[in-house]
């Protein structure tokens, strides 16, 4: 999630949507009765009832694209119902609320939350992140998303590795000796 937000913070109209800043994941719904979104429920009945989509396929689709993922309770802490309510929440809480919650994220200097804070600070400090001209480098590389932003005589290099494996990349000469502004990996060398 840090890799994705790192690249997204260089988009002009970036917003943080409920739980993104904590690294909250989509909640898996295993049964149609767990959904609350009437559009999702109606689509399930309409498409599976007409035989156009198998029920298992429709559940997979709704888990990926349904709106209820964005409607689950905010995970404030590791108490019952993630600290969202002392009552019964209207929709189920994410199964990882005991570890992924605001209380834990705010206390951990290496958390997704604190990475967001650093990026937002940089975004406010460095106009190039928002207003710089975008240029994609190495569009054929399937593992790395690397691009530059240019604003006047300033240049910014953004490198995102969307794999779990370490990747080799030759940094363009213009960035030799440049300062690393932020990284979600420990610095080496």
What is the predicted role of each segment?
Residues 1, 14-16, 30-33, 39-189:
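Carbohydrate-interacting/catalytic domains
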Residues 1-6, 11:
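Single conserved hydrophobic/aromatic residue that forms the stacking wall/gate
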Residues 12-23:
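Substrate-binding cleft of secreted/luminal carbohydrate-active enzymes
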Residues 23-24, 164:
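Short, glycine/acidic-enriched loop or turn micro-motifs at the edges of active sites
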Residues 27:
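Divalent-metal (often Zn2+) His-rich catalytic cores of metallo-beta-lactamase-fold enzymes
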């Amino acid at each position: 999630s840090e890799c994705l937000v790192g690249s997204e913070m260089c988009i002009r109209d970036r917003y943080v949507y409920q739980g993104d800043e904590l690294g909250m994941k989509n909640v898996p719904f295993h049964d149609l009765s767990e959904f609350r979104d009437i559009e999702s429920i109606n689509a399930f009945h309409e498409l599976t009832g007409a035989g156009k989509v198998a029920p298992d396929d429709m559940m997979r689709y709704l888990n990926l694209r349904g709106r209820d993922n964005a409607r689950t309770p905010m995970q404030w802490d590791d108490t019952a119902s993630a600290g969202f309510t002392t009552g019964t929440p209207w929709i189920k809480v994410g199964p990882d609320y005991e570890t992924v919650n605001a209380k834990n994220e705010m206390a951990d200097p290496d958390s997704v939350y604190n990475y967001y804070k650093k990026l937002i600070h940089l975004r406010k400090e460095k106009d190039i992140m928002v207003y710089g001209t975008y240029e994609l480098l190495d569009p054929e590389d399937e593992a790395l998303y690397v691009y530059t932003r240019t604003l006047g005589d300033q240049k910014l290099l953004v490198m995102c590795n969307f794999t779990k494996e370490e990747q080799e990349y030759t940094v363009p000469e213009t960035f030799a000796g440049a300062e690393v502004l932020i990284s979600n990996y420990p610095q080496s060398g």
